[in-house]
Amino acid sequence: TITSVLPKVGFKNTRYGNQLTLRHALSQSSGLPRHTYSHYIDQNMNYADVVSRLRYVNFVCPPGKCYAYQNVVYSLAGDMIKQKSGMSFESYVGKKVFEPLGMRTASYGLNSYNASPNRASPHIANGNRWVPTAVVSNWYKVAPAAGVNASIVDMSKFLLGQIGRRQDALPLAVLKPIQSRVTKNTPEQNYYGVRKAVDNTAYGLGWRVFDYGRNKNFVHHGGHVKGFRTEMVFNRDLQIGMVFLSNSETRLARDVIFKFLDMHERAQQAARAAKKR
């Protein structure tokens, strides 16, 4: 459990708190209210101080019984890794993921971002044009939930790992459990809303999972901090995937994954039609 590894982390309902596991945190089924204390991260509060306030929060359900998206609780995974491995979360991911996959320019943290000679600056809308804005450092504090710096080349390598092309680095024994449904959610909870063709939505371990049209088990996640938008979707069975990175808060990010999936569906339809000729 989380409290057995991190005894200084307390919860208001000690019975539920003592049941809370890493799996609950990663599958967004902690039982705490949606986005518990994310606003404190927005306000640039120290991460340790935010965690110390978890003891004041009422659970809305027992752990494992309901879905509610979290960033702070999710980031306890990093504290557990540090406690168990003796390595910081950032160093651990570098050693276990970035290096084996050859993600040579991927890193964590604002200092690494600023040290890169080839970095994209964030942009926000100002009227009908995009203007540069300062990097917001707040979310680098919750590294498991945010804070990766990576190029599209890095992310293409990560994508290949996720669809099983690099089993020397990410074996199926790792991929299958993290990409499988753990916590079911509703159209009101699932990020996609009520969208035609989207069905069977759930959260895995760090990933959203859904069916689309006649195809099953798409895996997806997106990101949004001031001046940046990202999306990634893939299907290991179909051996397809797409990564979208933008140094702006473009509206295109809201629809890009479904435009990609629709293109794939049309290609499948064309292939089926060609076989019938």
Protein language model regions, located:
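Second-shell loop/turn segments in exported
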Residues: G10-N13, T36-I41, P62-C66, D79-Q83, ...
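Residue-level recognition of oxygen-bearing side chains
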Residues: T1, V72, D154
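Short coil/turn segments at secondary-structure boundaries
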Residues: S38-I41, Y67, G109-Y113, N190-V194
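Active-site helix/loop module of the DD-peptidase/beta-lactamase fold
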Residues: T1-P33, Y37, R55-N58, Q83-P122, ...
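The feature captures the short pre-catalytic strand/loop hairpin that immediately precedes
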Residues: A48-V60, N126-Y140
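Well-ordered alpha-helical segments within folded domains of soluble proteins
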Residues: V73-G78, S156
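Catalytic loop of the DD-peptidase/beta-lactamase superfamily, centered on the K-T-G motif
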Residues: M45-N46, K82-K95, E99, P117, ...
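Mid-domain, small-residue-enriched loop/turn segments at the edges of structured enzyme/sensor domains
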Residues: T21, V72-V73
